[in-house]
Amino acid sequence: MLMKQKGIIIKSVDYGESDKIITILNEYGAKIPLMARRAKKVKSGLQANTQLFVYGLFIYNKWRGMGTLNSVDVINQHYELQLDLFESSYASLCAETIDRSMEENEVSKYNYDLLQFVLSKINEGTPAQLMSVIVLLKNMSKFGFTASFDHCAITGIQDQSKLIAYSFKFDGAISESALYQDQHAFHLSNRTLYLLNILQQLPISKMNHLNIQQDILNEMSELLIMLYREYAGMFFKSQKLINQLNRLEKDSL
């Protein structure tokens, strides 16, 4: 059966010498794995059109099991995103988080809308690192945990100016007066905790102009990766590349 569906490539894996297996998140929010034969060959016409983040109309044959890709009518290749290693790495973290948050046959129109929102904001100039923070925040519950950033987990105080760390022992932000109860708490600014809470609660439809300074953004990213590792046992492949790029940048200074 010939199928035509709009979607975004969220995963691409080499298969043999010349083929790829791609996964698209289609417009209905379903993950569709497709065999892209000869996609690694330049002459096939599929090499450029089977990269991560390509948004297009995918035409494929589907009977039983995995479909076979015939062609892609590209709507947006997000070519500039693919040229920037840092930006593409954080965008890959977004795609990987969304992919791994969904079961094989699960349908999530929200995740499709979230990914479209992420890519459109990156195109407008919003840092991909910030978009990865939003995706990680919005998908916590899919990995079986939540995190609270708006009050002290020990004293209950709701004055966010007093919050200075996140405690894995008490599963939440903690205030300066309670810090002595967890010597291993992860220290970060109250501004970081405040903005994490805002981004966690705010619907993506209400997120317009997004601008967060780099040091706060770095604290957000570090904490969220720690949360996913501690509470869900998650290790992201794309984060490994991000860590390598950060080390290279530090070594070059």
From Swiss-Prot:
Q: Which PANTHER family match?
A: DNA REPAIR PROTEIN RECO
The record's keywords, sorted A to Z, are: DNA damage, DNA recombination, DNA repair
Tell me the superkingdom of the source.
Bacteria
The name this protein goes by in its record: DNA repair protein RecO
Sorted alphabetically, the Gene Ontology BP terms of this entry are:
DNA recombination; double-strand break repair
Q: Which cysteines are joined by disulfide bonds?
A: none
Name of the gene this protein is made from: recO
| Record keyword Cell division present | no
Regarding protein family, the annotation reads: Belongs to the RecO family.
Q: What does this protein do?
A: Involved in DNA repair and RecF pathway recombination.
Give the UniProt entry's GO cellular component terms: bacterial nucleoid
Source organism per UniProt? Staphylococcus epidermidis (strain ATCC 35984 / DSM 28319 / BCRC 17069 / CCUG 31568 / BM 3577 / RP62A)
